[in-house]
């Protein structure tokens, strides 16, 4: 699941292999941040890595992306009379790509990109290890 863990200049990076249903497995960069700014040994980040592994064993990544797409559509259409449909949510979910993940001890920060629907924007979703969305931001690249 987590591979190619490297520690350089006090920072830890790796790849996490995800395989959502109906899709080919793919690797996503993951940054591990213990908030010390000075990671020297793998053992410093074991607690975070354990939480990440547990999260991805429990969470349905397709369901998570679907939930994020609903939140994005609600945020995008909040100022209008248009109510996003299930098809809108499904199309956005199919287009969303996880660019990278940053893992902290308390939560995860997912960065998403939607080339068809929000090509000039970046989407960040702060997710707890229980799978709850804490914060969603959509901003210019």
Tell what function each PLM region has:
Residues 1-18, 94, 100-141:
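Acidic, proline/glycine-rich low-complexity IDRs
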Residues 1-80:
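Long, contiguous N-terminal structural blocks used for assembly/anchoring
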Residues 56-118:
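Amphipathic protein-protein interaction modules
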């Amino acid at each position: 699941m987590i591979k190619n863990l490297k520690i350089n200049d006090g920072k830890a990076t790796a790849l996490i292999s995800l395989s959502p249903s109906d899709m080919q497995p793919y690797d996503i960069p993951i940054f591990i941040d213990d908030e010390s700014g000075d990671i020297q040994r793998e053992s410093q980040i074991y607690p975070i890595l354990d939480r990440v592994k547990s999260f991805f064993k429990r969470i349905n990544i397709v369901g998570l992306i679907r939930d994020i797409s609903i939140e994005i559509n609600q945020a995008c259409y909040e100022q209008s009379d248009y109510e996003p449909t299930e098809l809108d949510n499904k199309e956005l979910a199919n287009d969303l790509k996880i660019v990278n993940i940053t893992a902290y001890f308390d939560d995860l920060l997912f960065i998403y990109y939607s080339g068809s629907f929000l090509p000039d924007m970046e989407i960040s979703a702060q997710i707890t290890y229980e799978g709850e969305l804490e914060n969603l931001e959509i901003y210019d690249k």
